[in-house]
């Protein structure tokens, strides 16, 4: 057992409800409220760190109750371990809860944040600090009516956003009409079409043809078809000439290897909620070494989880497309400190860890030695 100042002596977790400004509708489900879990880890030195579990049941099968249940068990498993061994902790959590990546992610993030506080360094410095600069994110527009799509597009355009991630995948004709309306209103923007597995191969090809007919700029197709249909992903790349990003298809390092072996994508979308932080870094490094490109996104997250993802961008090289926008879709911000948004741009922070604080409620779950 670790006896250093980095020894984990307490884990706390509590549920948080954060309403969204507008319904978050994608091909696989709808969110009105982010039902997440915050985690806080305390070390023997007194250093504390925060993490967040942001399950999206339609995507990963996890929900808040399953996350809380997993965290109660996983928290016990890491008591007295050294947060300095965050890689070993990540591997242990993967072995103990292979089907609970969001819960693991929340606990991993809190351990790493606490460790960085103990070292008095920003989290991005732990990953090398190779690319510390302001970075631009896209903005997500959910599946909604034509009028609402235009309203949101004009609002975000006015706030400085120029890359619009359009949720698609339910109705090809309606998807094309929505993009065309935005293109006509705001001709200098570019699109990411995010299908969330909603299309068949033929539907995706029809969608791309429709966008090409009105000369829309389609920068990327993200996960247009089912996660296991690597053949169609490869065919869509070949037949459209549009870069393809694998999202739901990559939930592990082994998945990333399969994507690369099948020539199924140009980009891999890194999400710490799919894999935990340690494996996300491994996937990112492998992707780059294999000649593919990186984007990074998230579930419906606050600036805790999104800050951890941004730390990877700042610490490692190679993240070309940032989809780190969901805190902007929330009606309130339950955390203080940390990175800041300036329009479409994310600004790094300089203080230790994630430089974030969240106030626990009275009904927090506490895991510690008695």
Label each residue range with its predicted role.
Residues 8, 39, 46, 107, ...:
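Conserved, mostly hydrophobic/aromatic
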Residues 10, 42-118:
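Metal- or metallocofactor-binding catalytic centers and their adjacent structured scaffolds
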Residues 109-141, 148:
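Glycine-rich, aromatic-flanked loop segments that form ligand/cofactor-binding clefts
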Residues 166-305, 331-341:
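Catalytic core of soluble alpha/beta enzymes
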Residues 156-164:
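Catalytic domains of carbohydrate-active enzymes, especially glycoside hydrolases
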Residues 3-20, 36, 300-370:
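Flexible C-terminal active-site loop/helix
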Residues 133-148, 168-169, 200-201, 245:
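Active-site mouth loops of central-metabolism enzymes
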Residues 2-48, 53-59, 332:
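Structured beta-strand/loop patches that form or line metal/cofactor-binding pockets in enzymes
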């Amino acid at each position: 057992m670790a006896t250093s100042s980095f020894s984990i002596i307490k884990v706390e977790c509590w549920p948080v409800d954060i309403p969204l400004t507008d319904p978050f509708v994608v091909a696989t489900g709808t969110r009105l409220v982010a039902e997440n879990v915050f985690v806080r880890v305390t070390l023997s030195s007194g250093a504390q760190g925060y993490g967040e579990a942001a399950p999206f049941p339609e995507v990963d099968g996890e929900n808040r109750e399953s996350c809380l249940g997993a965290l109660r068990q996983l928290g016990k498993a890491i008591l007295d371990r050294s947060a300095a061994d965050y890689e070993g902790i990540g591997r242990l959590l993967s072995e103990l809860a292979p089907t609970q990546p969001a819960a693991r992610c929340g606990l991993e993030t809190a351990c790493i944040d606490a460790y960085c506080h103990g070292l008095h360094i920003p989290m991005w410095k732990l990953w090398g600090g190779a690319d510390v600069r302001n970075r631009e994110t896209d903005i997500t527009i959910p599946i909604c009516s034509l009028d609402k799509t235009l309203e949101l597009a004009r609002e975000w355009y006015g706030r400085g956003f120029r890359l619009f991630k359009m949720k698609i995948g339910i109705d090809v004709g309606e998807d094309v009409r929505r993009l065309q309306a935005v293109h006509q209103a705001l001709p200098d923007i570019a699109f990411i079409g995010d299908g969330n597995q909603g299309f068949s191969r033929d539907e995706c090809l029809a969608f791309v043809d429709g966008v090409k007919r009105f000369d829309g700029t389609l920068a990327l197709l993200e996960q247009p078809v089912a996660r296991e249909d690597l053949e169609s992903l490869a065919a869509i790349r070949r037949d459209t000439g549009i870069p393809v990003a694998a999202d739901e298809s990559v939930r592990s390092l082994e998945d990333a290897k399969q994507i690369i072996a099948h020539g199924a994508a140009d980009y891999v979308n890194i999400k710490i909620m799919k894999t935990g932080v340690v494996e996300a870094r491994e996937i990112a490094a492998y992707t780059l070494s294999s000649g593919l490109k990186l984007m990074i996104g998230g579930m419906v997250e606050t600036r805790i989880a999104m800050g951890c993802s941004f730390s990877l961008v700042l610490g490692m090289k190679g993240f070309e497309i940032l989809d780190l926008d969901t805190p902007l879709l929330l009606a309130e911000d339950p955390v203080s400190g940390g990175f800041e948004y300036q329009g479409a741009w994310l600004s790094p922070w300089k203080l230790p860890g994630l430089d974030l604080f969240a106030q626990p409620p009275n009904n927090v779950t506490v895991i510690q030695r008695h």
